[in-house]
Amino acid sequence: MRNKRKYIRTTGIILLFCVVLLNTACASKQKEKVVLELKQGLLSLIPLNQNAVRVQFSQPGSAPMEELIYTEKLPVPEYEVTEDKQSLVLSMDGISVEFDKGTEVLTFKDANKRIILQEKVGGRFMKVSSVQNEPTYQVEQRFVSPKDEYIYGTGQFQDGYLNIRGLTRRLTQVNTQISIPFILSSKGYGLLWNNYGLTDFNPADQFVELTPANASGEAVTVNTTGTSGNVRETRQTYSFTASVDVPRSGSYSLLLDVGQRMARKYYLVIDGQKIVDVNNLWLPPTTSAIVELTAGKHDIEVQGERNDKPVLYWRPVSEETVFRSSVAQMLDYTVFAGNGDEVIASYRELTGPAPMMPLWSLGYIHCRERYNTQAELLENAREFRERKLPIDMIVQDWQYWGKYGWNAMKFDEDRYPDPGSMMKELHEMDVRLMISVWSKIDAQSEVGKQAKEKGYYIPGSDWIDFFNSDAAAFYWQNFRTGLLKYGIDAWWQDATEPENDDLQNRRINREQTPGEVYRNVYPMYVSKTIYEGLRQDDPDRRAMIFTRSGFSGMQRYAAATWSGDVGHDWETLRRQIVGGLGQMVTGLPWWTYDAGGFFRPGDQYTNTRYHEQLIRWIQAGTFFPLMRVHGYMSNTEPWRYGEKVEHIIARYLDLRYRLLPYIYSQNAAVSFNGSTLMRPLVMDFPEDRFALEQNYQFMFGPSILVAPVVESGVNRMKVYLPECSAGWVDFWNGTPHKGGIFTDVNVDLMKTPLFVKAGSILPLGPQKQYATEETEQPWEIRIYPGADGSYSVYEDEGINYNYEKGQFCTFDLKWNDSDKTLTISDRKGSFAGMKERMDFNIVIVTPESGTGIYQSKVNKSIVYEGKSMVISL
């Protein structure tokens, strides 16, 4: 038995020790961390909670990084340190990290002492660099990634990859791309790379610059949108060519950089084979792909715009995962051990819980670019009510400020003569309003002139410098006095990247800091300003912020994101679903897209091919955390597309509203338990290889498997039903299916494949026109037999923060499959307006009952008055 020394942290006492680590250095154990003094620098192991360890590698005297992510002040967890001649191990209940004294490699293990992650030998890298003539470091860490690992995350990207093992990505904030340096692995860990600037994931150092060849195709004029409003642009495609030599055959990761801040087209051909072909009026400047190449020379063609300067980067796909940041104060990352829920719950414990979203935000959000007048907005809200189409919120997009200048924090009275009466009428219809507010302010506006005089702009731009606390306070003051007074319900913070990665080569924070240092965190500063202002100045209204970009920790500011200004085609639909799932694993739980696409065809109202696309976008979006439609220069209301389309959309609106008791209970699980509503299959089936390979299927809460239709003309499609001992039940027809199989599903335009896990209990509410509508109609409690199951129902007022004071209630539904009994627990807690009596129709799902959207045959009707009940069925 090896001789070991053991050190246990004792509360309130700092134990220090120094031992020889072979030929390296010594270690000191402090109250909050263990510091290893290596020849190359200081390696700190910092226990954060029982399943998370932070690793920092720095140089002596390095200034600590400003803490923007880990804001929760938690006690130092109990941990112990053991040491022998070969290693030093820091251990907690849920994770341990072992330092190898010979290789200086860190190995991470879970609660069962199973290796979940390991650094590569020689994979820790830190070198002196500079940014804007100021000293900084370039840092890099390489990890071992076995071939059977699946990795997800880094945020919302447009490359179409859900499993990003081996894929190269460049993490910057631009329209349609939300960069979050967090990954989740099928091996049972999450990793957050603690850096606020540009980060390269699996960076490719080999590259070729392509040279212009010729123009191809005719010039076309298109309508586009940007920070200066609607613009018509003339575009023509140009070809660029090059060749590359690869030394060996195998898989290669490619990163195409178009050489501008935004792209309009990705078109990459290798040896005549099309690799990428994507068009949109807005695209991130980089995209990625993994291809198989044989050893030798390969001809490359890229098509783009005349001013593009395309560069193709490439690297062999190998058994490693790499993070690299070019601007850093130290190498800094955190490892979380556990399954997907445990990882994200741990992350939120450290970075802040996601507040409860308002109940009404989980209904239907209707948006278009744009309503031009107060009368037009009210007319369309009335039409929703007259047509009995459920809606909770209507959205006023940009340019309501009119003659006062961009984002002047006021309505142009020529078109919006009385915003107060507009809000009153909307609220009388039980319709909420979201309004677009930007971080950019016209420097010639009244507010802009003040901002310029006070030095509150980021120099050389029209973006407010939210890194300057005085500038942020100024912004909120004008926000409060100009807009908050009307009782507006939700706030759309557009273009918060800021648009086009606009901090590069700029100075921020009173010109004291290079923008590159905080290049990816601007959206979090904006959301923080708005959320904290709302909590202070509108404390009785539950906040909802809608923003186009995000970063780690932003969930604590009641911020939801969407996928930006995307197109409408099938490929774009597929990429949005993948992008949303990529964000879900990073801990930011609220997301959606522009259902139907932001950029739509000119004949959208009569084009039946587009109608099919629109329906499939809306069907998928019914099962997103937020359900929303939007479109550029479009009247997006359902009735514009004809009776057939309107009827199908109405059915899915009904389904969304019937699911609200289920969705709102998951809203509580997100806030209280660190859960996730829209769930890539790795979160529930990490051992199922076929599940891990499904790009478009996902779980909606713990019970519902969603398989969106993402291709044209589909009448029948294959759906994978993950391994599940009790199997699955078809939502539409009640047919049971085994788990771990592919099944063929008949798909017509009315249906998107939905399966419910056997043993699930779905609480379905009555049909409603808005989420907070009071009705005496009963709930339907659907029981999917085949296994025991349970569901915890949560209720509160839905519109305020009284839940933070304990004013909410819960009750549990438990199904015993063998004796066919449903037990309803005592109700726990209470809140103002709580129904003392609830009517339930209980249904055991079979092919003859409990199928589809609407209520059907009932097994038993009961009255629940808050006391425990056992119902035999």
Tell what function each PLM region has:
Residues 22-31:
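Bacterial Sec-dependent signal peptides at the C-terminal "C-region" and cleavage site
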Residues 46-91, 124-130:
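A low-complexity, Ser/Thr/Gly/Pro-enriched, surface-exposed linker/loop concept
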Residues 532-533, 540-543, 550-562, 583-593, ...:
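Catalytic core of carbohydrate-active enzymes
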Residues 58, 118, 277, 287-289, ...:
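Aromatic- and carboxylate-enriched substrate-binding clefts and catalytic-loop regions
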Residues 45, 55, 90-94, 240, ...:
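Short, well-ordered beta-strand segments enriched in hydrophobic/aromatic residues
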Residues 83-356, 368, 374, 381-386, ...:
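Catalytic and substrate-binding clefts that recognize carbohydrates or anionic sugar/phosphate headgroups
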Residues 65-80, 267-287, 454-457, 730-749, ...:
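Solvent-exposed beta-strand/loop surfaces of large extracellular or lumenal domains
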Residues 12-23:
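Bacterial N-terminal signal peptides
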